Amino acid sequence: MFFRNLTLFRFPTSLDFSQIDSILPNARLRPVGPLEMTSRGFISPFGREEQEVLNQRQGDFLWLTVGSEDKILPASVVNDLLTRKCSEIEEKKGHPPGGRERKRIKDDLIHELLPRAFVKNSRIDAMLDLRYGYVAVDTASRKAAETVISEIRDLLGSFPALPLNAEISIRSMLTSWIAGEPLPEHLNLGDECEMKDATEGGAIIKCQHQALRCEEIDKHLEVGKQVSKLALILDDHVSFVLGDDLVIRKLKFLDGMLDQLEHSDTDGIRAELDARFALMSAEIRRLFLLLEVPLKLSKANN
């Protein structure tokens, strides 16, 4: 259940979430219709089979899950059928169908195929920290994260959440850390980084499974390369890769945190998920607050 990536947004802490339990049922995921391509809505964080609990609230943390049902209709299948249909028309009429007729035929084919198309189920989780006003969406895709924010906005009627940004150059800060400048307290370098030329379209160097403070890295820095992604470790609790787009990738919870889970009193799957969410949300908050000051992260207007 642990999140693996974090795309972050800020929102005003003055927002009221007290009615969340009463409004969520109206935004529940409904099955995709026979002639629909997709359906989105909220599902229980504890799984689609759970019908009563559509969110999880622990203190200032709120866990929401957006579920999707998407029809799988490969373009190659549609295009093959379209080619056959157009060939049949050309044989009968002596000329191929025009652009407008071709589009109509394609729409008719899609309309015919949709009820028989396979349905792909997916989910994206989000954690809202109501005290500090940020959303952590479990995806590295900005587009997918925006979809979740849009669903929350539709749910609440208004949700002025904005993508996280910084008042400084993230590349410059990451580069300074790898060059030897002090890191924020409790953070250490990992064993992975990506470096890019300052010029657009320049060389990209990817380093993995190696010490980052070394002669090889220094040579890249000397010729002007800047760090665009950097692996970091928060104590022995969390490892992650921070990008210059402020997306946190490859999020992994380490033994220092997991040991707490092993010693917690959990009885059953639901209790274990509650315990995991409590530990994970606390670590994500600690990480967020640790990065907020040195990176001068944006705040939302209340």
UniProtKB/Swiss-Prot annotation:
Alphabetized InterPro entries for the sequence: RdgC
HAMAP family reported for this sequence: RdgC
Keywords associated with the record: Cytoplasm, DNA recombination
GO biological process: DNA recombination; regulation of DNA recombination
Protein name, as recorded: Recombination-associated protein RdgC
Family: Belongs to the RdgC family.
Primary localisation category: cytoplasm
Domain of life where this protein originates: Bacteria
PANTHER family, per database record: RECOMBINATION-ASSOCIATED PROTEIN RDGC
GO cellular component annotations of the record: bacterial nucleoid; cytoplasm
Localization, UniProt: Cytoplasm, Nucleoid
Role summary: May be involved in recombination.
Pfam family, one: RdgC
GO molecular function annotations of the record: double-stranded DNA binding
Gene: rdgC
